[in-house]
Amino acid sequence: MYDFDYIARSDGWLTSYNAAGLHGAVPVPGVSYAEAYFGKQNGRFINYWESDDSYDFGLKTESFRRFEKVSFYGKMQYRYFRGQHMSGSILLNPGDRPFDLVEFTPGTKTREQYILSGGVGFLLTKKLTGGLRIDYEADNYAKRKDLRHSNTMMDLNLSAGFVYRFAAVELGANYLYRKNTERVLCEQIGTTGENYDMFFNKGVWFGEKGLWTGNGMHLNEPGISGLPMKDSEQGAALQIAFR
């Protein structure tokens, strides 16, 4: 009896973005798993945007299914994170962009993450299979102390490809498309009269530091509410497998 991870690692096509490789690679009629998890993290050996006292929990399920002419992969996941004493970057994934926005008042932050993935590989001829795959993620992120921020992010990955099987060699090719959007809103709700600084990091900690006054710092400019960010990518990949 094999567990899910063992089967997922048994063939490179099962973890490839080219879902055409699914058909012919799933070694069993079907396998699934579901889990609930909880984690607790404490310690000061952290990066400037991380928490020294946090926890997270979530639910996750994955599945492979094989039929005569079609095979499927699916995944659903939910994750909740709560961290204390957090400041630093106000972006969801610092390091993914060529700039950063940094604030300096520690507070509690929460993040909710939703992930949905699916792939299908189908037989076109005896030697040729096609495939489609989608990976979708949505995140909400918020700080609950001034200077407060709230983020929404969407990450979408699409792939379409094929695999041609020779006697001892499999050749694959697929097209990749990715779209990522994130929007950040900042606000000050408290009436203590305290002033809050922000730093716009343009790279390797060169940039501009300013006093938050309800606008500026690229977060609330004339005609723009919040900081909208958008990335679009297209690409292609080739695969070869020897049997």
Feature-to-residue mapping (PLM):
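Residues on the lipid-exposed face of transmembrane beta-strands in outer-membrane beta-barrel proteins
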Residues: 59-65, 116-122, 158-164, 238-242
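Outer-membrane beta-barrel channels and translocator barrels
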Residues: 67-70, 123-127, 165-167
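Flexible, surface-exposed loop regions and adjacent strand-edge segments
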Residues: 89-95, 146-153, 188-197
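Extracellular loop and loop/strand-boundary signature of outer-membrane beta-barrel proteins
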Residues: 44-49, 100-106, 142-148, 221-226
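Residues that define the transmembrane beta-barrel architecture of outer-membrane proteins
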Residues: 53-59, 110-116, 150-158, 230-236
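Long, internal scaffold/assembly segments composed of regular secondary structure
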Residues: 208-243
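Transmembrane beta-barrel strands of outer-membrane/channel proteins
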Residues: 32-40, 74-80, 132-138, 173-179
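Outer-membrane beta-barrel proteins
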Residues: 41-45, 83-87, 141-145, 182-186
